[in-house]
Amino acid sequence: METIDGATTGARLPRLNEPAPDFEATTTHGVVRLADFAGGWLVLFSHPADFTPVCTTEFMAFAAIYPELQRRHTELLGLSIDSVSAHIAWVRNIEEKTGVAIPFPVIADLDRAVATAYGMVMPGESTTETSRCVFVIDPIGRVRAMIYYPLTTGRNTEEIVRLIDALQMSDARQVSTPANWRPGDKVLIPTPPTVETAAERMTEEFASRTEGFERVDWYLCTKSVEAV
């Protein structure tokens, strides 16, 4: 069992490709449930506290990418161990001071139920602050990616968009994406599973029937694909 400051939580932390922990929570947009996001992608992220400088810049950055995420059938859901009133006051203050409206809901996780289920409170850290966590949940409710940032470091939100693009490409085309991949770049062809298919990968016949095919060796080949 996982512990937080020596206390047993009884919660099993999420794992990649397993069902995301279910939840029902109060937010700045009313009560939300994990099931509300079924059929689309969800980026669930936590921040340490309202009215703090790094978190404020992150919320502005998340607001900036929100239209891009929606075009990818992806929703945003924030979380911290603060009250709804604190969340509302903070997002209103952000808009008043910067002109940036926060369009997505923010969970008020005062009982730490969601934070505990998702492992957002680090052992040895304050139990009233969540770490900078990001969970990507797919349309059938599986955890597909998890990212943890230190308290001092704001997140790169464009990387989150890139991650969504890569996951959606992999699901749609049954391919992998190389380092620093962006939409429009070539993708990686899955490694051959047998000696025979590895040998076939080295033939000109295979190359001729694969659009945009490039080969470094039998295990490292790329091809062009249409956008998802």
What are these regions (language model features)?
Residues M1-V228:
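Chalcogenol-based redox active-site neighborhoods
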